[in-house]
């Protein structure tokens, strides 16, 4: 996990900070490639507080339960929040991929889930869909990188570049407002460890402006 909650019970000053950034100096904060996102919303802050209290009480990993709401509306925009490993986050990522109409971009430290790899390949084979991806851990055990390349998916390795590509985000249909421009980000790598063992969080924001900001990155 990498999140902060500020004043969850405040109606005007409730904040959540999420994304991929560890508070480590100097690597993650100043050198590695990461993203941080701030959301001001009381309901989302309270959902994160429920998750924090569960872990504060000693429940981690598979001992946690799916006890938080997942769907919110912030300034008229749909926002979703999922925690791992309790909330079946991978199934939501699969839906995110399958719902793409035109474009999908992803930037990931690790990508080792076969089901997600297959979903990306199947989506890339659909007429009119353009997919681009960046993966840091090209040669880690079980990496989907070689499978994606062999299938003709436009994916690039970040391995060997100075400083780590520590992101865990994906962007759907960023420049197609007739579709559903959406950002998916957080601390959840596309891996079985993130799905089944690690304590992670994922934020999905249905908003063209936010999606385009991440597309520019």
Predicted segments, located by residue:
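Charged, low-complexity intrinsically disordered terminal segments
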Residues: 1, 5-217
């Amino acid at each position: 996990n990498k999140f902060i909650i500020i004043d969850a019970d405040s109606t005007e000053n409730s904040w959540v900070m999420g994304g991929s950034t560890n508070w480590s100096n100097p690597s993650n904060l100043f050198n590695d490639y990461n993203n941080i996102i701030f959301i001001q919303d009381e309901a989302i802050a309270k959902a994160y507080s429920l998750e924090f209290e569960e872990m504060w009480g000693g429940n981690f990993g598979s001992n946690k339960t799916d006890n938080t709401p997942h769907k919110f509306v912030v300034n008229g925009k749909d926002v979703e929040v999922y925690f791992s490993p309790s909330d079946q986050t991978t199934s939501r990522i699969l839906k995110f991929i399958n719902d793409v109409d035109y474009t999908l971009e992803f930037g990931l430290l690790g990508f080792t889930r076969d089901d997600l790899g297959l979903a990306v390949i199947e989506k890339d084979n659909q007429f009119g869909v353009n997919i681009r991806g960046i993966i840091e851990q090209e040669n880690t055990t079980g990496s989907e990188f070689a499978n994606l390349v062999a299938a003709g998916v436009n994916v690039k390795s970040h391995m060997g570049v100075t400083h780590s590509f520590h992101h865990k985000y994906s962007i759907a249909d960023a420049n197609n407002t007739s579709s559903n421009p959406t950002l998916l980000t957080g601390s959840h790598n596309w891996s079985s460890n993130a799905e089944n063992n690690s304590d992670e969080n994922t934020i999905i924001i249905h908003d063209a402006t936010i999606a385009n900001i991440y597309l520019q990155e």
